[in-house]
C-alpha cells in the first residue's frame, strides 16, 4: 500500500487516497482530510464521523447512506448538505474508512 503524509503524519492509503489502517486515524487527520475536500468540520460532522467509526468497528464495513440515516437518525438530505456531492464517499474518506461498497 502507498504511504502519504497528511497533517505531518505518514499514513497508508489505497490508490484513491482512502486510509487503509483504521488505527492511523485521529481528529487532527480528519480535519486535514476534510480540508482537502473543502469541508470545515462542525459538531454535526463530528457526530456522523464518530457514528461511522463506531459502526465500522462493530460491523466490519463502512456504513451506507441509508444505514447512517436510519441508525444515526440523520436525514439523507442533511448528509448531502454536510458532505455535498458524494456524501457516502466523502464521509468515509474523512472518517478514515474504506470507500463504501457500491461507491464509484
Regions found by a protein language model. Name each.
Residues 52-54, 85:
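Residues within well-ordered alpha-helical secondary structure of globular protein domains
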Residues 18, 28-43, 56-65, 74, ...:
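Noncatalytic partner-interaction/assembly domains of nucleic-acid and motor enzyme complexes
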Residues 47-51:
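Pre-recognition alpha-helix immediately N-terminal to the DNA-recognition helix
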Residues 13, 65-104:
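Helix-rich interaction surfaces within compact, conserved domain-sized segments
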Residues 4-35:
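N-terminal first-folded block
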